[in-house]
């Protein structure tokens, strides 16, 4: 028995297919989904969605959004996403260095919107790197 998985971003249908298992990065921690899962709506954090099909794992970098789980169907609506195998790791590593450099310019206890944006950029780059390695 498989789960029907759809990952949708505003400008693209990122992934549509079956999976034996899905692991989602929710804002409260990872959620593992198997066929017959209880119904649930959750906020998705910046992170990596993992799906298993035919004993092989695939990763998708997610940039925040929402997910709806209904028994054997998972629909993920995100701001943006990238299939791990399509990510240029060098670009992701360069983005991580740039974001970390931007953070280092702020005092440690500062909570400005610019610093929060830089912290988000670090999270996005880390998610892209992690997804590209799986």
From Swiss-Prot:
SUPFAM superfamilies: Epsilon subunit of F1F0-ATP synthase N-terminal domain. GO terms for cellular component: plasma membrane-derived thylakoid membrane; proton-transporting ATP synthase complex. Its main location: membrane. Keywords: ATP synthesis, CF(1), Hydrogen ion transport, Ion transport, Membrane, Thylakoid, Transport. It is found in: Cellular thylakoid membrane. It is a peripheral membrane protein. The keyword DNA repair does not apply. GO terms for molecular function: ATP binding; proton-transporting ATP synthase activity, rotational mechanism. Disulfide bonds: none annotated. It holds the Pfam family ATP-synt_DE_N. Transmembrane segments: none annotated. The keyword Glycoprotein does not apply. F-type ATPases have 2 components, CF(1) - the catalytic core - and CF(0) - the membrane proton channel. CF(1) has five subunits: alpha(3), beta(3), gamma(1), delta(1), epsilon(1). CF(0) has three main subunits: a, b and c. Produces ATP from ADP in the presence of a proton gradient across the membrane. Belongs to the ATPase epsilon chain family. This is ATP synthase epsilon chain. The gene is atpC.
């Amino acid at each position: 028995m498989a789960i029907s998985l759809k990952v949708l971003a505003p400008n693209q249908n990122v992934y549509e297919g079956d999976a034996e298992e899905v692991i989602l990065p929710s804002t409260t921690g990872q959620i593992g989904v198997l066929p017959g899962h209880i119904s649930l709506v959750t906020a998705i954090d910046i992170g990596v969605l993992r799906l298993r099909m035919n004993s092989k794992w695939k990763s998708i970098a997610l940039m925040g959004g929402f997910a709806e789980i209904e028994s054997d169907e998972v629909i993920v609506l995100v701001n943006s996403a990238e299939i791990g195998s399509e990510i240029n790791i060098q670009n992701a590593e360069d983005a991580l260095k740039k974001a970390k450099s931007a953070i280092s310019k702020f005092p440690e206890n500062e909570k400005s919107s610019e610093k929060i944006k830089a912290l988000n950029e670090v999270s996005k780059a880390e998610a892209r790197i992690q997804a590209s390695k799986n």
